[in-house]
Amino acid sequence: MDFTLDKYRELLTALKLHRDFKLRHDVDLRPDFSLRIAHIEAEMDLQATYYFRVVPESYDKEIIQQIVSMGHTAGYHYECLTTCNGNMEAAYEDFLHNLDKLRKVTPINTACAHGSPKSRWNSQDIWNHYDIHALGIDYEPMLDTDFYTTLYLTDTGRRWDGYRVSVRDKVPNHQERWEQEGLTFHTTDDIIHALSNIDHPIHHYSLLIYTHPQRWMPFGMGWLKEASLQSLKNIAKRIIVCTKY
């Protein structure tokens, strides 16, 4: 059974065979689910970065502090161009305001954009006009990662090959090359099996692992609901991708 807490533990165990990896989490919803994942990682002596949106369904001061207290770090999951309807100046001010709000809770030196698949705007485009690093942000994954040496794996769409239907959560200039090298995975078990094979090309790369903690839960009604919802969302995103491109 995929996307359960037990399966996540199995993934972490397999990742330890690789050694060169970073764990990143987009806290789009349900920060309490992120807290649960943070506990699992801490129990396994692993540290991760949790990117929080500054919206009621993600931002929770107490949970952020609890996660950081375990040795994890927090980042800002920004969506300023979407919330400001494409107004670049307003988006920049919105970014500054929310960054300041988060920094009153915990140090923040990393940020990544929320995908917002239904939005006309890609919030990452703000950095075509402003300098994110001048704001004390040392690392923006899509701007500061060398994807020639780092493999990006994300569970977007509740699958590990969700880039096929994703609007923005992908690395366009590298995805085809990774496919040619056999570095595409559909299930978590696919990744675990690759990590368990020392000769697999996955071991030629550093790994950047991105998950959405609200997708990982014990099997039950919540799991079934999430699986069904993501299937419908993937159909909608595929339509958007086909329409746009």
What spans do the regions from the language model cover?
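Terminal accessory/targeting
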Residues: 1-24, 28-49, 58-59, 68-70, ...
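Histidine-centered beta-alpha loop that forms part of the nucleotide-sugar donor binding/catalytic region
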Residues: 53, 79
